[in-house]
């Protein structure tokens, strides 16, 4: 009887530890490469760039490449963002619902800040510095996709 009881306790403990590992895994997603063929490189746009070569606003929002950017952005989002922010940008509560991000240029500044610098609180990474892993073209494609699924609060 004691052996059976110990086995049950050990199983419950193991299951609890497995679940705890999943809870702490937020933010530990390995970024996946994004193919941006079909999008004009940022440096070739006529937008003003900052000292680091970053555009302050989305170069694809009103361009003929918008639909291609949405397509690439949707794929990039699913590969790199959905694990935390939810499928179709519908958050399950772990991270912000990105459909609510200010649409158009109003949200570009916040977007650039987050993807370039991430978010760290109390030494814990809540949002990785995605600009360390993905090209600016890929990240602006994600932003274009997010604009396409935007909803008002």
Please tell me what each predicted stretch does.
Residues 19, 88, 102-105:
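Residues at alpha-helix boundaries and short interhelical turns
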Residues 1-3, 70, 74, 140:
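Short alpha-helical segments used as structural interaction elements across diverse proteins
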Residues 50-55, 66-88, 110-117:
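Sequence/structural segment immediately N-terminal to covalent heme-attachment motifs in c-type
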Residues 89-92, 123:
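Short amphipathic alpha-helical interaction/hinge segments
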Residues 2-8, 12-68, 145-153:
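Post-cleavage N-terminal segment of exported redox proteins
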Residues 93-98:
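Short cysteine/histidine-rich zinc-coordinating motifs and their immediately flanking basic loops
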């Amino acid at each position: 009887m004691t052996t059976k009881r110990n086995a049950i306790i050990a199983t419950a403990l193991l299951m609890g530890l497995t679940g705890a590992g999943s809870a702490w895994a937020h933010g530990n997603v390995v970024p996946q490469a994004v193919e941006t063929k079909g999008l004009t490189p940022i440096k070739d746009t006529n937008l003003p760039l900052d000292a680091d070569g970053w555009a302050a606003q989305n170069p694809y929002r009103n361009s003929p490449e918008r639909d291609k950017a949405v397509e690439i952005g949707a794929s990039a989002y699913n590969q790199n963002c959905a694990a935390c922010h939810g499928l179709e940008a519908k958050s399950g509560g772990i991270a912000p619902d990105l459909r609510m991000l200010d649409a158009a240029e109003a949200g570009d500044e916040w977007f650039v800040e987050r993807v370039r610098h991430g978010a760290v609180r109390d030494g814990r990474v809540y949002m990785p510095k995605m600009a360390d892993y993905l090209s600016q073209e890929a990240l602006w494609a994600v932003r274009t996709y997010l604009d396409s699924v935007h909803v008002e609060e």
